[in-house]
Every structure is written in C-alpha cells, then in structure tokens.
C-alpha cells in the first residue's frame, strides 16, 4: 500500500571493514556492496509492519585491528542499528561477534573465514561464504592430486585468518603425503621477506603456502623473483586471491605460479554474477576486489528476515534468520544450525597473463 511520508521509518544497517591502512581496498569494495544493496532496496519501496522503510548504511572503520573492531561494534550497538554486515578479517570479526551477541544485533560476514567464528553458537552470528576448512583443504587436495607436489614450505602472518588457513592446509597436505619442509612466520604489516624466503630457498620446496593477505603476498612474489625463486609456486586462501595482488606484484614472474582459493563460485558461475558485476563496475569502476557480491547479499538476507518477521526489530526478526532461503547473487543462501552457510562452494584461481582466471 501507499504509506504516507510520515509513516516512513529509517532503518540503519551497519557495515564494518578496514577503510584505512593496507587493507582499505577490501574494505571499500565491501562497503560498496552494502551501499549498492541499500540503493536497490530503497528503490523497491519496502513496507514492513505497515511502514515504508528507508534503509541507511552506517559505515565504520575497524582498520583490521581487533580492539578497534570491538569498539566500533559497540558504537553500532549504541547507534541502534538493526543489523550489521561485517567484518572483513577473522581477527576483528571474532571478538566483535561477542559484542553483537551481547547487544542482540545480528551480523552477517561475507568475508571472515576462520571456522572459530561460529564456535560459540551465538544466535546473532552468520557467515555466507565457505570457511577456511574448505579453502585450506581444497588447496591441499589440488597441490597433491592435480599438481603432484612433494615438498611445500608454509608461511603465515599470525592473524586469526592467516594462521588458521595455514594450519588447515598443512594438516591436509601432510595427510595427503606432502612433506612440509619449513614453517616460517611474519606479520600482516611486514614488507621485507628476504630472510624467511632465503631460509625456505635452502629447503628447495615446490611451493610456498602463504596464510595472509595480498599486500604481503605481492611483495613476497617480487622478492621471490629477486632470489631466483620465480619457479616456486605460491598457494594461498581468499586473502591473496585479489585483483590488487597483480598491481602489488608489479610484473613479478612468480605471479604466474600463484594458486589461490576463494569461497563461492566464480562470478561467471554465480546465479546473478555477470549482470551484477556489470552494474557494480558502472558504479565503482576499478574498485572490485572479492567480497562485494557477498556483502550485497548479506544486506538482502538481513532485510529478507525482517520481511518474513514483519518487523525491523532485531529482537523479533533475528529468530527468522535460521530459516533463510534467499536466492542471492552469489548462491541460494540457507544456514546450518551453527550459522554457517549450507553447501558452500569453493573456486581455485591462477593468474594467467596477469589476469585472475578460474581453474575449475
């Protein structure tokens, strides 16, 4: 029905990701996904509980820092948002999830992949992408079965994400008969990897698995070239599986040996992927990274639960999230009792002629 202007209710949806620092390119892409969803929702003139709803995004920057992550989560609780899309990093999402649970606001991440996120069993925590158990294992199977690799070195950045995905890869690879010849550690701020790469080179591995993000992986690829290691493959999870790594690696030969995994189908195989991407690129040229289709879907999943509950009150509509069966851009989204996505897909990619290309 035609709800009159005074019957319009503003409903705020929070978004959190690093909007500053070395991971801001992911954060911007995620924020774009939510902004685009909100624009599309507002064009639909959604009516819930007899009121015309105007959705607004409240964006916060967690700078990929766990302390800042919990602080902005509390800020969103205080701002009375109806739901949150975020965060990007497992290291910020896991502590923030407790804050959202305590204040009774549901959050959906389309990016944080550490399996521990859903362990506490909060009724407010949901993930709409494959977790690291799927990513790390998928990469190890490919290394062993398709590439028949024998010796692999492992490096991780000691974050919840990097350490987690590296551990799963290592466990699965060892079970498949791959020898882990060296294990080294770095940080998510490091730029110089010459010492650890030199140590690894002495062990003569077929590949390096890197648990971490693209800024470090790209610099590592350049330094591998300098050390005459451009024939050593680099494996990694979704954190390195970006368009940005091509720029960061700036012509490194070693980029040709990268194999990375992402949760979900490739854009071309997503139900609404191709049309959605064209629309995104028209709005935000050159900003696409990885997760914006997921943050777009996450926004719609929250609103879909509000519609089914006929309420925008988190205390009321959160109970409808477990029954989600939402046909999104990325896939049809339904949840396990834990809040994990049902039937998650993963896709492996390589970089052919400087372009990110799906392997399967």
Task: For every predicted segment, state its role.
Residues 5-360:
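Extracytosolic ligand-binding ectodomains
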